[in-house]
Amino acid sequence: MSRKQLALFEPTLVVQALKEAVKKLNPQAQWRNPVMFIVWIGSLLTTCISIAMASGVMPGNALFSAAISGWLWVTVLFANFAEALAEGRSKAQANSLKGVKKTAFARKLREPKYGAAADKVPADQLRKGDIVLVEAGDIIPCDGEVIEGGASVDESAITGESAPVIRESGGDFASVTGGTRILSDWLVIECSVNPGETFLDRMIAMVEGAQRRKTPNEIALTILLIALTIVFLLATATLWPFSAWGGNAVSVTVLVALLVCLIPTTIGGLLSAIGVAGMSRMLGANVIATSGRAVEAAGDVDVLLLDKTGTITLGNRQASEFIPAQGVEEKALADAAQLASLADETPEGRSIVILAKQRFNLRERDVQSLHATFVPFTAQSRMSGINIDNRMIRKGSVDAIRRHVEANGGHFPADVDQKVDQVARQGATPLVVVEGSRVLGVIALKDIVKGGIKERFAQLRKMGIKTVMITGDNRLTAAAIAAEAGVDDFLAEATPEAKLALIRQYQAEGRLVAMTGDGTNDAPALAQADVAVAMNSGTQAAKEAGNMVDLDSNPTKLIEVVHIGKQMLMTRGSLTTFSIANDVAKYFAIIPAAFAATYPQLNALNIMRLHSPDSAILSAVIFNALIIVFLIPLALKGVSYKPLTASAMLRRNLWIYGLGGLLVPFIGIKVIDLLLTVCGLV
């Protein structure tokens, strides 16, 4: 479930962003953006020149210099506004999270058990290792692990999902988040963080951008922009002596205008906004990224490790067939399977009971009246079943039943082995049923592949992304499901060690790997992966190991995360292409205007037939400022994303943003020149 999206130009955010844009005019703020810092210096210099001209200290057109100076300041303000608006949108999203944080009191237990004496203390004084009791109606005061009890918890304040979730001690559902509310029962929680370090605190800090650092690609692009700026600065500086030697020295105001129009101010002014907006779009998808680096890495990912259950398949395996062993009637197998599943409350267990009822009209028997002993499933035995009327019936995995049969002096039939392989090849999971030491047959549990998932994997393949299915199933079952789903590869009988080894193998080949996880056993692999999306419903260890947290706890979200990352990289690349292409048109506007008096041959470059040198220069400067404003929506929303190959994507962007970057300034500068001329402003 995604959070409510803010309007792109929310009035309150726009007003606040305008105020912040003015505050950012101070040199300390401008220094962080070298390209815009040059524009800021140029604005200051031309302001001083226009004042000197107006007071008669310097000769020249004071009105023209003032107009150039004013539009240069507007350029800086627009760049500041773009960044402030992006930050403001993120802070508005963070404010909704701040509403969750409430100064409250907690019941700190003196002993780690329910019923122990408790002290009432402020929640912000709780330390790591403290034990607290929370009951129905209480707000959980800290992040922690449930060590006793079980309760229904409302996590909507964090996740946006209204349906309550169960949190209980033991297993992968013991992690709780501060700021969520207990709906029923009680929990004894051990705090896992100190004040200011909670998940909510980290979310707020990350969303507000307080911890935002430039990503490697952003740093590389900044270095390129600085290099271009230095080249244009040196080139512009050499033009004054050339013009002076020609007998008609160009004014400093014109040279500053030329420099500002030639350096890549468009992308320089929008670069920070693109980075902030990328993290904001992640939050819009209910994913919290720990840094811009994580979002950027998502765009570069070329291997996706996807859990089978819940991501590729629906995750609710259903009994589809009873396959009896040689000499056993199918009805006898169905009867034994139903008995063994009467106390099994899992979806698989209930589906076995229902299938037996549908196939052979075997009505579900009253559990209480059977006077039977039910044997629950355990990770060690990997079986469950029932002891009734001297009958010992079990169902479980092939290996577990084989060990059970051999331990009871029996023999595992070869025909059942063949039936197990047959079920596995069809992409189903085989469960074997045994009574005493006699194997009765196989139950086929069919997991349904999600609709449309094969097409999504085909799109990812077009983009050069390899998909790998991770499953605990045997190789035959895994191979069948992998073929049906259309993944490129699979890892069967996966263990935490196997997942970690696979990630390292791909990284050794120079690939970037993304994966999801929710359990403590996923933590090593999450820590190793380049993009690690931890489920919010998972353990604290998993969330700390990942560099993103999915508040919806939806493993399929990994594909969307990659799309958002790629969209951010595409936006940055597209606007850089557009910005650099812009310079060509501005060159044709300003160079003839500035130097035609000295070198008349340059009039041949005035292909736009602009009205006068002053109108040409002023039109280029105005366009240079306005284009930043027009591109703010694109920087915040991101460019249109389509799953294409790298070469096709490059061609598409060159046509749209390269050619567009050439044509738009020619049209824009000419229109502005006509308006200035018609209005008599030049």
Swiss-Prot record:
**What molecular functions are annotated in GO for this chain?**
ATP binding; ATP hydrolysis activity; magnesium ion binding; P-type potassium transmembrane transporter activity
Which Gene Ontology CC terms are recorded? plasma membrane
Q: Where is the active site?
A: 307
According to the UniProt entry, what is the EC number of this protein? Answer: 7.2.2.6
> Which cell locations does it reside in?
Cell inner membrane
Where ATP binds, per the record, is at 344, 348, 377-384, 395
Q: Which InterPro entries match?
A: ATPase_P-typ_cyto_dom_N, ATPase_P-typ_P_site, ATPase_P-typ_TM_dom_sf, ATPase_P-typ_transduc_dom_A_sf, HAD-like_sf, HAD_sf, P-type_ATPase_bsu_IA, P_typ_ATPase
What keywords sit in the KW lines? ATP-binding, Cell inner membrane, Cell membrane, Ion transport, Magnesium, Membrane, Metal-binding, Nucleotide-binding, Phosphoprotein, Potassium, Potassium transport, Translocase, Transmembrane, Transmembrane helix, Transport
Q: What residues form the membrane-spanning segments?
A: 34-54, 62-82, 219-239, 254-274, 588-608, 616-636, 656-676
- Which Pfam families does this chain map to? E1-E2_ATPase (PF00122), Hydrolase (PF00702)
Residues recorded as binding Mg(2+), renumbered to this chain, are 518, 522
Which Gene3D superfamilies does this UniProt record tie to the protein? Answer: Calcium-transporting ATPase, cytoplasmic domain N, Calcium-transporting ATPase, cytoplasmic transduction domain A, HAD superfamily/HAD-like
Top EC class per UniProt? translocase
- Look up and give the membrane topology term: Multi-pass membrane protein
What is the catalytic activity of this protein?
Answer: K(+)(out) + ATP + H2O = K(+)(in) + ADP + phosphate + H(+)
Q: What does this protein do?
A: Part of the high-affinity ATP-driven potassium transport (or Kdp) system, which catalyzes the hydrolysis of ATP coupled with the electrogenic transport of potassium into the cytoplasm. This subunit is responsible for energy coupling to the transport system and for the release of the potassium ions to the cytoplasm.
Family according to the record: Belongs to the cation transport ATPase (P-type) (TC 3.A.3) family. Type IA subfamily.
User: What NCBIfam families does the entry give?
Assistant: ATPase_P-type (TIGR01494), kdpB (TIGR01497)
Query: Whom does it interact with, and what assembly results?
Result: The system is composed of three essential subunits: KdpA, KdpB and KdpC.
- Annotated HAMAP family: KdpB
State the protein's name: Potassium-transporting ATPase ATP-binding subunit
Instruction: State the organism of origin.
Output: Escherichia coli O127:H6 (strain E2348/69 / EPEC)
